[in-house]
Each structure stands twice: as C-alpha cells, then as structure tokens.
C-alpha cells in the first residue's frame, strides 16, 4: 500500500460559472443558491454598475428588447428586471462561506463591488 502524505496545498475551488446555469437561469439567485447546494465552493459572474451605483450580476450588461436595449449603467437598480441580482443580494442569499470570482466589465463598478463585499464581511474571499 503506498504511503500518503499530508499536503499543504489548499483544496481546489469548485467555481460555478454564472451559477448552476445548466439547471437554472444563469446569473440568478436561483442559479447561485443551487450551485452552493450542489457543492460549489466558489461562484463566478460578470459584474456591472447601475445608474445609481450598485454592483449587479449579469453577463451582457444590457436589458430590454432588441429596439429598446439599454446598458445597465443607464438603469437604476429598482428598474432592473427581477432576475438581475445585486452583489449584496448574492451575499444575502448564499452567505459568505465560498469564494466569489467577479469579472468586472465596467471599471466604474469596482468601488461598489468592494463596498458590497466589505459590508458582507467577504472581502478576503473576493477574486
């Protein structure tokens, strides 16, 4: 029987890209909660800033139909479709016991991202 040795390496992070998007609409609280329930130890999303300064999670950064599309930076958080969560809502729904990797698509979102992570006590697990 081979000898096994303890490792100093931390365990791998199992990131759920846009949540459990194979089983729930991507980048929704439903998808992120499901990913955590299925064993993800990390959550990943793109992040944008709204007109009123909130960090929100969405892939495309636009809302609306073909002829009425608007960038998230032009829309207040309260006017967004219900399926687009804020980063603060992600922390409320899923807790802070996992890593969060954010692809910052809008440089103006950085302060809002840091504020939300800091308020949740999750700054140390933010990628």
Predicted segments with their positions:
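A general structural detector for well-ordered alpha-helical segments in enzyme core domains, enriched
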Residues: 31, 86-90, 109-116
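An active-site metal/cofactor-coordinating segment within enzyme catalytic domains
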Residues: 4-14, 41-42, 47-99, 105
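Active-site mouth loops of central-metabolism enzymes
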Residues: 16-26
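Alpha-helical structural signal in soluble globular domains
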Residues: 38, 93, 112-120
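Feature marks short, surface-exposed loop/turn motifs that line or immediately flank catalytic pockets
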Residues: 22, 51, 108
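Catalytic beta/alpha-barrel core
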Residues: 79-83, 99-109, 117-127
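Short, acidic/polar
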Residues: 24-34, 84-87
